[in-house]
Amino acid sequence: MDSLRLGTYTFSSRLILGTGKFSSTSAMIKAVRASGTQLVTVALRRFNREQAEDDLFGPLSEIEGLTLMPNTSGAATAKEAIKAAHIARELSGSPFIKVEIHPNPHHLMPDPIETWEACKILAAEGFIVMPYIPADPVLAKRLEEVGCSSVMPLGSAIGSGQGLSTAEMVKIIIRESSVPVIVDAGLRSPSEACAAMEMGCEAVLVNSAVAVARDPAAMALAFAKAVEAGFEARNAGLMPRSGSAVATSPLTSFLGATR
């Protein structure tokens, strides 16, 4: 599978994994290893080396070839997100930052105005900026223009498991973007991840669907296989849709010859 390029980094895996909601750090680490992912996102509050039970930085740092992408989850404004990004870079040493600004805890929809403000500043400061956004083609283009390394439109609401309810808007974003489009949030099943890749996404980010599965490691592996299958299918060339049936083995000439 071709490499995913984000900023100056390349990744052979196109599955990005979130690290929240797992029943234990051990379960999360097993899922990360099973998935083969090379990029995981971690909330700033989980960088806590003084309290081992809350710290994810240490265990994740032990996985060879894994890059950490801190996120600004919990930020309600651009100012808070920028502050969180600075702290995260100092603690992790990672140039990546996933900008998440969702001020309303009831629906967790990303704030487009505050997100744009934060991304403009962080990109200028040299971060590899990956914003979580509504499936808005205009916003996605504006974020690309200020220097974001990718755009991450939601498939549906965070943790909802409602799948690719924004598929038509995501398709427009893909057509108009010059940076990788990565579906983030709402995916429930590996088949939805496969569909996202088939439609043209460069990667998918999954968290809840893996974390709350009966067997997170097995589900992580299933998502990894689905992402690869979707990417390979797209490159192979999906057959066009037809409004009517098209016979695969026409028998007209054969039947005529036997009369």
Swiss-Prot record:
Cytoplasm is among the record's keywords: yes
GO molecular function: thiazole synthase activity
Position of the signal peptide: none
Record field: catalytic activity: [ThiS sulfur-carrier protein]-C-terminal-Gly-aminoethanethioate + 2-iminoacetate + 1-deoxy-D-xylulose 5-phosphate = [ThiS sulfur-carrier protein]-C-terminal Gly-Gly + 2-[(2R,5Z)-2-carboxy-4-methylthiazol-5(2H)-ylidene]ethyl phosphate + 2 H2O + H(+)
Annotated metabolic or biological route of this protein: Cofactor biosynthesis; thiamine diphosphate biosynthesis
One Pfam family hit: ThiG
Gene Ontology biological process terms, A to Z: thiamine diphosphate biosynthetic process
Superkingdom of origin organism: Bacteria
Record: residues binding 1-deoxy-D-xylulose 5-phosphate: G159, A185, G186, N207, S208
Location in the cell: Cytoplasm
Enzyme class: transferase
UniProt cross-references to InterPro entries, sorted A to Z: Aldolase_TIM (IPR013785), Thiazole_synthase_ThiG (IPR033983), ThiG (IPR008867)
Keyword Hydrolase attached: no
Active site positions: K98
Entry keywords, A to Z: Cytoplasm, Schiff base, Thiamine biosynthesis, Transferase
EC numbers, comma separated: 2.8.1.10
GO cellular component: cytoplasm
Family statement drawn from the similarity comment of this UniProt entry: Belongs to the ThiG family.
Biological function: Catalyzes the rearrangement of 1-deoxy-D-xylulose 5-phosphate (DXP) to produce the thiazole phosphate moiety of thiamine. Sulfur is provided by the thiocarboxylate moiety of the carrier protein ThiS. In vitro, sulfur can be provided by H(2)S.
PANTHER family documented for this protein: THIAZOLE SYNTHASE
Subunit and interaction comment: Homotetramer. Forms heterodimers with either ThiH or ThiS.
Protein name (database record): Thiazole synthase
Lineage of the organism: Bacteria, Pseudomonadati, Chlorobiota, Chlorobiia, Chlorobiales
Gene: thiG
